[in-house]
Amino acid sequence: TAATQAKGAETDGLAKLARIEMKVDTSYLSAEERQVVNLLNQAALLMSEIYKRQATPDYDRLRAEVAAKNDPKLLEKYDAFYGPWDPIEDNKPFFGNQPKPPGAGFYPADLTKDELDKYIAAHPDQKGALTSPYTVVQRQGDRLVAVPYSQAYKQWLEPAAKLLEQAAGITTNPSLKKFLTLRAKALRTDDYFESELAWMDLKDTPIEVAIGPYEVYTDNLYGRKTAFEAFVTLRDPKESQALDVYKSHLREMEANLPVEEKYKNFKRGFESPISVADQVHGGGDNVPGVQTIAFNLPNDE
């Protein structure tokens, strides 16, 4: 029947995803490192709670509507994709018929790029705040206002910051302690630069963690707003060492890129760490839909 076909269309996207158990060898971790990883896993879950609201306006209301349908497969798909749109099918809605707003949950659903451009032109003093990678744009009457992430998502960021501080208090690795301490501060202040530098300096620890607002792909309105995510990984020293041969040729690779000379950047740092790692836990932007197998962070912003 037509109803049966419609129901099947709502859930068949799950068939394209294979559920695979990823087994990571954690036997070599010390008791201290194990404690730190467990705390980071908890913080990663909070990044997911934030990203659900960034990806889907009215996330909680829509999920309640899906749950009321008493269709386990439909609810499973909603939870798998953090909303009613299928990213594998170019964000085609599988619940309801509303297209995904270009600005996702970063802007009012009815806000257009043209309206935002005109508003910024009329209020140039607000441009920095409205286009910041770390603010949510909301309507207040006829005005557009920028709400810092640290305020908009405080109910998740504050406990996440406390978890990072707790982990920092446990680890005896100086570089990891510094990064986690600074990252906790950044979650409360929206100033991530110092903690990004500390992240680049992580050393002498198997724990590689990236946590915070990074990529802007979810913002299809302005391409500015960063999405929260987390990668809790354990470095594979043997496979990472195998990449050292490529690190020694980074300058040559830059010189041989098939682009005009003006696009080649020889002022960049060529000592950037490159690692192979096993992911223990993901959070936020890297969880729904197709999984990330590599990342290049931090971004210049």
Outline where the language-model segments fall.
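Accessible peptide chain termini
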Residues: T1-A2, E301
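N-terminal mature-domain "stem" immediately C-terminal to a signal peptide or N-terminal signal-anchor/transmembrane
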Residues: A3-P93
